[in-house]
Amino acid sequence: NRVPYKSAPETEAWVSDSIDVAKALGCKNILLAFFSAGDLRNDPAGKKEVIRRLKKVAPKAETADVVLGIESWLSAEEHLEILSAVGSSHVKVYYDLANATKMGYDIFKEIALLGAENICEIHFKENGQLLGQGKVDFERVKVSLDNIGYKGWYIMEGAIPKGMEVLPAYRQNLNFVSQLMKS
């Protein structure tokens, strides 16, 4: 995020190299984060350059069968505009529930709009709260994801209350997610 993909020349090689590394490790998804200096909100020139760069590297991702996942502050509609412009089945959205909620997006409509075919992974996250104790309605999220037929990864992230140690927090988060997935 300090060295933005939208403007730093060296990031083109980094993303290209990350495809080789992911393939060698057997990883299917690469997270491309667009925050801080890399933020694409209100930046048409930045979006245009990201699209240009992704179009250039997408064939390599396709050959390697590795997905480049965009995580950003953008809405589902804006993400779909980028995906459509790039035109590759190997460029998708790495959807972060807490970020989208923080932005005021209707995450249930966004999930339906994106569809399973455009989401590579989901961040289960509550900023500063344990999963299920913050603003995200995970029961509705699960129903929404089931409705679109999402079968990908769920990644627990950033769900630790201030002052709580990581291991106990993630044990509780894992228990919450396990129970949620059984419902």
Task: Go through each PLM region and give its residues.
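Active-site acidic/histidine proton-transfer and metal-coordination neighborhood
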Residues: 1-93
